[in-house]
């Protein structure tokens, strides 16, 4: 597997105006071939999406989803650039899909890994570095393993990193990128809230035998 250097990533970024992470993924998939990486970005619609991702998105929808039985509910705000797009079926279906995704993702806490404060990341890294299974390893190796674990931890909690429930071959972030390329406007998930019935409440625990006895009048 070809080594992907920061210089290669920046070169691809300059040519395509695509984000660093997408450039790195494309280069890895293309085994370091710049032209193949550009072609991959084109095929995935990422190049087209990259041109509008920095544009301000202040329109959109607040979508909701209530799971069958009414035990789980979701509210999510998804922004786009124009009211015209917000009223379109393509965008509205995307919002519904994202709300359903959040309902099905109990571990998700934030939209993107970028939303996590560096202080929180540093604190988790400090904890991981001191794990007992790493203490015997060389400092450099220990730091690399710890960083990998922390990255994995936050990715598991980020909405955009989750495999899309309707197509596990892409992430939620990649789904949104595809929609940006198709619709031609910037789209961003701004915030969300997930509600679970009874979450945080302490249920009264009863002795089953005593409860039955009380109901039958034998106590």
Swiss-Prot record:
Function: Associates with the EF-Tu.GDP complex and induces the exchange of GDP to GTP. It remains bound to the aminoacyl-tRNA.EF-Tu.GTP complex up to the GTP hydrolysis stage on the ribosome.
Subcellular location: Cytoplasm
UniProt record similarity statement: Belongs to the EF-Ts family.
Name of the molecule in the record: Elongation factor Ts
Short name of any one Pfam family annotated for the protein: EF_TS
Gene Ontology molecular function: translation elongation factor activity
Annotated stretches, region: Involved in Mg(2+) ion dislocation from EF-Tu: 82-85
Species of the source: Gloeobacter violaceus (strain ATCC 29082 / PCC 7421)
């Amino acid at each position: 597997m070809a080594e992907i250097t920061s210089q290669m990533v920046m070169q691809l970024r300059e040519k395509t105006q695509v984000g660093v992470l997408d450039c790195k993924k494309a280069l890895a998939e293309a085994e370091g071939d710049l032209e193949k990486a550009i072609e991959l970005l084109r095929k995935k619609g990422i190049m087209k999406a990259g041109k509008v991702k920095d544009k301000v998105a202040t329109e959109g929808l607040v979508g909701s989803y209530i799971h069958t039985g009414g035990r789980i509910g979701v509210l999510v705000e998804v922004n786009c650039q124009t009211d015209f797009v917000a009223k379109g079926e393509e965008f509205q279906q995307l919002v519904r899909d994202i709300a359903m995704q959040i309902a099905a993702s109990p571990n998700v806490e934030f939209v993107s890994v970028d939303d996590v404060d560096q202080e929180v990341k540093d604190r988790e890294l400090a904890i991981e570095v001191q794990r007992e299974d790493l203490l015997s390893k060389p400092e450099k190796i220990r730091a690399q393993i710890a960083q990998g674990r922390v990255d994995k931890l936050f990715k598991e909690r980020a909405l955009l990193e989750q495999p899309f429930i309707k197509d596990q071959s892409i992430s939620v972030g990649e789904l949104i990128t595809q929609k940006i390329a198709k619709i031609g406007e910037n789209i961003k998930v701004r915030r969300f809230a997930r509600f679970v019935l009874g979450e945080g409440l302490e249920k009264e625990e009863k002795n089953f035998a005593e409860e039955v006895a009380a109901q039958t009048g034998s106590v």
